Amino acid sequence: MNKEWLEKINMTLEERANLEKWCENIGYKRYESICNSIIEKTKRKSVNYSVLKVIAKYDFCLSDFLHSMLKFIELRFRSYLDNNYGELLITRQEFLYQISNKLTNGKRGLDCSTYYDKKLKDETTLGEFLTASSMETLLRVLFLLPKKELEVFNKNIAQLKEELTKIKNARNYVAHGQVLLFNEKFNLKEMIVLMLKYMPTKESKLKRIDELDKLNKCLFEEECKLPNILRESVAIVLKKKEFEEIGL
């Protein structure tokens, strides 16, 4: 394994031992990626251990932050389907085709029987099925609902489908422990704003924003004062237009 990048970090022997221990637990590639991105941003040949440590910690914390919101959003849509359609009986054979017939009065059929969780009984309810299903299957069922009903979540149905698909895809980055900061393929701030938009209440949105503000203050003011160029490119700070987009 290539460890040459470790030589780019200004650190003591004790700090190096700590860093290698974290790398063993979390993965060298993740730390190496963050280290190289910091050097690229600052246009310097090395990075201080304290800076690498706090930015890596921020990346991990944001991963947990997104994961928490993902679970909340998923629960919101599962609860809606469960409360309104949870008692619908379905069988193992062509289960989703049956769901689509029942939810659309036979107007649309969608056969995805391969998604059926074999742990479920041959006959089950939609509520039990959704509990055992992935978010992908949850959205397949949700998008069968009439447009009028989906307007509860967003007046623009095409936008709702596009945004929830983005949120579903974001799970892959979070679940597989990929670096979120400095990632050109993953617009972290855009994704946080999008998830906040689907928090169910004003209070839940404000609570998450407060958590983000406290995290920024704790890491970048109290734990390690970052150079401005780094702080501006790393810290997620919401502005007026984003508050409006979230609905605040």
Locate each region found by the language model.
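Extended intrinsically disordered or low-complexity regions, especially N/C-terminal cytosolic tails and loops
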Residues: 1-162, 166, 181-248
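Histidine-centered active-site/metal-ligand motif
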Residues: 176
